[in-house]
Design a protein with these regions (language model features):
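A charged, aromatic-enriched C-terminal amphipathic alpha-helix characteristic of glycosyltransferases
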Residues: 138-141, 155-186
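A structural motif in glycosyltransferase catalytic domains
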Residues: 6, 19-23, 39, 143, ...
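Conserved donor-nucleotide binding/catalytic region of nucleotide-linked donor-dependent transferases
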Residues: 125, 148-166, 191
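Conserved acidic donor-binding segment of nucleotide-sugar-dependent glycosyltransferases
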Residues: 101, 119, 131-141, 149-154
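Nucleotide-sugar-dependent
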Residues: 15-18, 70-74, 82-105, 114-126
Length: 197
């Protein structure tokens, strides 16, 4: 069912907004002869009018204030692709290279296919690529090409919905993480008790 709905939820600082503009531009070009994709952005961040104009044309792209997580989950259910993005500029690329955004876990758990658009050396991108849990785009030049590929072969979305869900269950199940954390804390507490006696 068209249009294919893409959703981004999170901060757009550290020049993530620039990556979102690349995506918005590609969508606008593809939608030239009819709406094939839409992009919804949910964020607490405020942007200037020039940026807002590029991210909120009310046809291809829609810019919204952040919403509570329970409401966001409903928006994910209405969407096809959840985005994870980082900036491509050198300074910001280096500042997030070793980080792993908790938003990745939200994306994997969203019920959507996940699309990562960032430098291939970024920690989250490398993880998603290794796990084959996301549609991975490592340069802005490939965004339009990938979206056209998805439009002509929408089964890619269902394949990556399944892969994202499987990765989330395999590696990020909340109960398992809580158990592991509890065990870690108990080990630390035990060691501290042992050494203080």
């Amino acid at each position: 069912v068209y249009p294919i709905k893409i959703i981004y939820a999170g901060g757009i600082y550290l020049n993530r907004w620039k990556t979102l503009i690349h995506i918005a531009k590609a969508i606008k070009e593809i939608n030239n002869e009819g709406i094939k994709f839409t992009l919804d952005i949910y964020t607490n961040n405020v942007v200037n009018k020039k940026i807002l104009k590029k991210l909120n044309d009310n046809t291809n792209c829609f810019f919204h204030k952040a919403i509570p997580f329970e409401q966001l989950k409903k928006e994910y259910l209405k969407s096809d692709i959840a985005l994870h993005v980082e900036s491509f500029d050198v300074k910001n690329r280096l500042s997030v290279r070793m980080s792993f955004s908790t938003k990745i876990i939200d994306c994997l758990d969203s019920g959507c296919a996940v699309m990562a658009v960032c430098d291939k050396k970024q920690g989250g991108f490398a993880y998603l690529k290794k796990e084959d849990a996301a549609i991975c785009i490592e340069t802005p030049k490939k965004i339009k090409w990938m979206l056209e590929r998805i439009y002509s072969n929408p089964s890619i979305i269902n394949d990556y919905k399944k892969k994202a869900l499987e990765c989330g269950i395999r590696n990020h199940k909340k109960n398992d993480i809580c158990k592991e954390l509890k065990m870690d804390f108990e080990r630390i507490a035990y060691k501290n008790d042992y050494f203080t006696d």
